[in-house]
A protein has these predicted regions:
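Amphipathic alpha-helical dimerization/coiled-coil segments
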Residues: 1-3, 24, 72-96
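N-terminal helix-turn-helix DNA-binding core of bacterial DNA-binding proteins
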Residues: 2-41, 63-75
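Glycine-centered, phosphate/nucleic-acid-interacting loop/turn motifs that mediate DNA/RNA or nucleotide
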Residues: 56
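Short beta-strand "wing" residues that participate in macromolecule-binding interfaces
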Residues: 60
Length: 96
């Protein structure tokens, strides 16, 4: 996992919103389901999902003709822990 890639993917508000939507679904979702009501074109949602997948925060599985997307909770949690640890080290050094 590349922490830089994760934060770069999450820096875009639409991708972050899409990640939250995937997390809220609690079950695998298709691109068309995730695009519904988002006001964003299906192809754009698909590109955003590809970037999130490349960053490792979501995974996709092909079932027949459909591709289903789910949150990689462990990756998100591990990334946030790495950030917290890095900040804790920085803050601890400043307190010395």
């Amino acid at each position: 996992m590349n922490i830089d890639k994760v934060f770069k993917a999450l820096a875009d508000p639409k991708r972050l919103s899409l990640l939250v939507r995937v997390a809220e679904e609690r079950s695998p979702s298709t691109v068309s389901h995730l695009a519904k009501g988002s006001g964003v074109d299906l192809s754009v949602v698909s590109r955003h999902l590809a970037m999130l997948r490349e960053a490792g925060v979501i995974k996709c599985e092909k079932h027949g003709k459909e591709v289903l997307y789910t949150l990689q909770t462990d990756v998100v949690v591990r990334t946030l822990r790495q950030l917290a640890d890095a900040l804790e080290c920085c803050c601890a050094e400043k307190d010395l």
